[in-house]
């Protein structure tokens, strides 16, 4: 396949955007050195801005080279349902009624575990939230887990190593934890219909292996940082008044409705507007809605949709050159530099793939979903919520990569050997 000029430009901008994600701290330093233009440098230093910014550059170049008709046609044919859904579910999952319910569930589980200090709560969050993602979707699970981990652990006196290890395990566990069903994990969703993978297939081929890996990863990081967790007393109870049960039920029903109609933006956005009205009517039972963070994440994902739509010309041949044994490792590595749903989507376009190839492609894609912020669609949501708790308000990409590597290896072994 001979690439067009725009495809070559899009590939170049895509790799520039990837490099930009590794250089956000450079822009933060520029903001301190050059206060006159600190605003623009701070903007470019936001990880969530990166892909949206370079997608805008691509669209401007498309207007200049191809004309307005072709440029607008390309944008109109992109599917922005996922960014809209992630925005909606982030805001709705981060509310006081939902968080109080999740906190109560974690506290009840921690009591059953009988572990010292904060170990029980920590272990419960890293196991329950990712597995719950198979039913409430991964973005909702990521938002809940990140909010709980931020409030109860990362905002307190803990080491940077602990913070990176927590983020790495969270990203990997959420990526693999959504594979118990065929609708919650974006890379699975892309292939479930064309490959006829139902919930029974997912549970028997992926789900139990993923659940085992999630538990091993969570237990491993808990044991590794047991001294910090044992010395960390349980987080103090929230000073907020308990939310009335009818309001909790209304919030849960609206969130469930959004999840059920996740592929119908006209419906779930209508539910979101109703949720905003409800939050405004009962503002005394609401905390600040995370609208800014959710909008940044949606901008990031929308940019990924625009840039990613022109990468098929080089990505698909790379995948098809591999056999079923090689594609697992290839998909795991490629996922770190692309979106894992994009990888599996490209695989779904190819006919005649063996069952072994299909399994290896999806298993590799979800295994590598925690290595970088762009590897899995929910990762930017977790990053936006937890990043302020890290030193200088920034997460080092290499630090995240190294922190996620052990959990990634555990997940890979589970999918390959079990």
Named regions from a protein language model:
Residues 2, 6-31, 164, 168, ...:
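Juxtamembrane and boundary regions of transmembrane helices in multi-pass small-molecule transporters
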Residues 1-8, 40-48, 69-83, 199-209, ...:
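Interfacial loop-to-helix junctions that mark the boundaries of transmembrane helices
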Residues 8-26, 46-64, 79-92, 144, ...:
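Hydrophobic mid-bilayer segments of alpha-helices in multi-pass membrane transport proteins
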Residues 65-68, 72-73, 99, 250-355:
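Transmembrane helical segments that form the transport core of multi-pass membrane transport proteins
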Residues 90-96, 116-117, 128-140, 172-181, ...:
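Helix-loop-helix module between adjacent transmembrane segments
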Residues 59-75, 89-108, 131-143, 309-317:
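Transmembrane alpha-helix boundary signature
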Residues 114, 120-176, 190, 345-363, ...:
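Hydrophobic transmembrane alpha-helices that form the pore/transport pathway of multi-pass ion
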Residues 38, 224-248, 283-292:
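Flexible interhelical linker loops that connect adjacent transmembrane helices
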